[in-house]
Amino acid sequence: MDASRSDVLILGGGVIGLACALYLLKAGATVRVLEQGTPGCGSSHGNCGTITPSHAAPLAMPGMLGVALRSMLRADAPLYLNPRFDGPRLRWLLGFARHCNWTDFHRAVEARSAILQRSRHMLADLIRDDRLDCEFSEAGELYVYRTEKVRAADERHHAAVLDRLGVEAQRLRGDEVEAMEPALKPGVAGGLFHPGDARLRPDRYVAELARRVRELGGSIESGAKIDRIDTQGDRVTHVRSTCGVFSGKHVVMALGAW
């Protein structure tokens, strides 16, 4: 067998690429992962590590287009768009605007909630069965509101949505939040506690995924910057990288947003 060929060639060694590799290896496939840096670097390494079925609401909702446009004035905005209107960006904004309605919002909420709930339980099973040492905690997540205005807005667009989905969200008074988290500055308006949420240490999680991939016989090529992808018709025939030329019966693109 050609050592550079595998059943599945995965481009990108972040959390998605490594998780795909692990499940494919368990299914009996031979797998090779190409990663331009080191396994799990980038955004898979540095993030808050929360696992949140409570975040079922999509970004596209009525009123959000105005938020997106106003964010162009603040480089530190949570949703920031560079105020440069080229073709692709304008098409994205128009598509985003078309989905900022309640019909699409509720349809997306139901689909996202189903995926989030299933993945939350699958993740717990994976961490337990493969003994992944990543500081996984199922203690829930607490969200704190400093003002009543923000709390009331989140009640309409967040907590009430979760109620309809059957996702538990516990409303807390300000004094209850302060009792739960004594280090908070007094004057909290209220809070939401999501007992179904979880968290982990993302850098440890991706390192553990990489460990299990190697233990099960998978290959991870670090420093493999992709130079070119050769195609024939609608199939990828070869992937040329700084670590060599590779191929696979199937190719998984897990290269991230950038």
Kindly give the residue locations of the regions a language model identified.
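Dinucleotide-binding Rossmann-like beta1-alpha1 core, especially the glycine-rich loop
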Residues: 48-173
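Helical element adjacent to the flavin cofactor pocket in flavoenzyme catalytic cores
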Residues: 153-164, 184-250, 254
